[in-house]
Amino acid sequence: MIFQVSHRLPLSGSDCSIHDWRTRMSWLYLFLAGLFEIGWPVGIKISQAAETRWLGIAIAFSFMALSGYFLWLAQQSMPMGTAYAVWTGIGGAGTFIVGVLFFGDVLSLMRILGVLLIVIGVAVLKFSS
């Protein structure tokens, strides 16, 4: 064999198996997918105004494509159900926060409780896989 890959890769100064490295990368990809998931509803919201319609549509499609790409990368090394649940959780909670901070969405105790339940569910999925 001309090219041989070591079964161990360094990560942050410590040895880590390829499986551990792939798992860490899949969680990074999933986190990025979740962040990009926040962008497409923002793009749709921006497109509601006539003067920013095409900009908003371009933002929405760009973020959808990036979110899908990173979700695809994440699912190569983790269960589909876990990836999808975490992806939608990050997207939902992040979109809620952006809506409250930048678009004047209502902030109530019940809505905060709902987002906290999403975040807790995502944490449980993270630690169970």
Enumerate the language-model features and the residues they cover.
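Intrinsic disorder/low-complexity segments
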Residues: 6-10
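Polytopic alpha-helical membrane proteins, predominantly small-molecule transporters/carriers
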Residues: 3, 17-129
